């Protein structure tokens, strides 16, 4: 479920970004600036995510990532009208998002191993299928909700200056909802304890496989 919230965060941030740049900052050209900073930072943190994972485990690394994402989005909720602050927030969101993405596939794989440990059946191919499904669901959900919020706020693409209700709606889609997704994901991870028992799970599975091959 936490991975779904991370996907929602990404989908809303990307889906509402262009609307936000035009409706709040006044120019769609600004979107490329803060979006590029986020993408580059996320790519870098994705490649170094193994460092905190090795030191603190997948659960704690994801919680660190969610915290950094929440800080970036929280600052954005307050000072999102300022391009410089928005770029700073984008760097923070990219840093945290890279950690979250780096952990995501690992958590799905661990869950599959846990299922095999509990049931004796390994669900081959479920990991990639799950991530693909979650990505599609989050993108579709985000697109629908962003469109609905824009419609409710009276957003008009052809208008240079949006009304106050439309601007608030853009902030909801681009800042407030992503912040809530980070918070919900963090709360769920508090109750995640698979990291603690996973070494035993791996040992048990290895023993079963050895016995099966004898």
Model-predicted segments: where are they?
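Membrane-embedded alpha-helical bundles of multi-pass transporters/translocases
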Residues: 1-214
């Amino acid at each position: 479920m936490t991975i779904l919230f991370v996907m929602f965060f990404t989908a809303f941030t990307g889906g509402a970004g262009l609307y936000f740049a035009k409706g709040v900052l006044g120019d769609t050209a600004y979107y490329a600036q803060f979006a590029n900073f986020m993408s580059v930072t996320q790519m870098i943190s994705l490649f170094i995510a193994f460092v905190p994972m090795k030191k603190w485990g997948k659960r704690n690394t994801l919680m660190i990532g969610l915290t950094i994402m929440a800080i970036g989005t929280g600052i954005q909720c307050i000072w999102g009208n300022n391009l410089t602050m928005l770029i700073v927030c984008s760097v923070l969101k990219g840093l945290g998002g890279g950690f979250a993405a780096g952990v995501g596939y690992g958590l799905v794989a661990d869950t599959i191993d846990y299922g095999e440990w509990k049931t004796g059946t390994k669900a081959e191919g479920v990991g990639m299928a799950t991530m693909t499904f979650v990505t599609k669901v989050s993108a579709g959900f985000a697109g629908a909700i962003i469109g609905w919020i824009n419609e409710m706020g009276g957003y008009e693409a052809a208008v240079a200056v949006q009304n106050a209700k439309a601007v608030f709606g853009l902030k909801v889609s681009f800042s407030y909802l992503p912040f809530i997704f980070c918070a919900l994901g963090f709360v769920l991870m508090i109750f995640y304890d698979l990291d603690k028992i996973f070494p035993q799970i791996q040992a048990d599975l290895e023993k079963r496989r050895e016995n099966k091959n004898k």
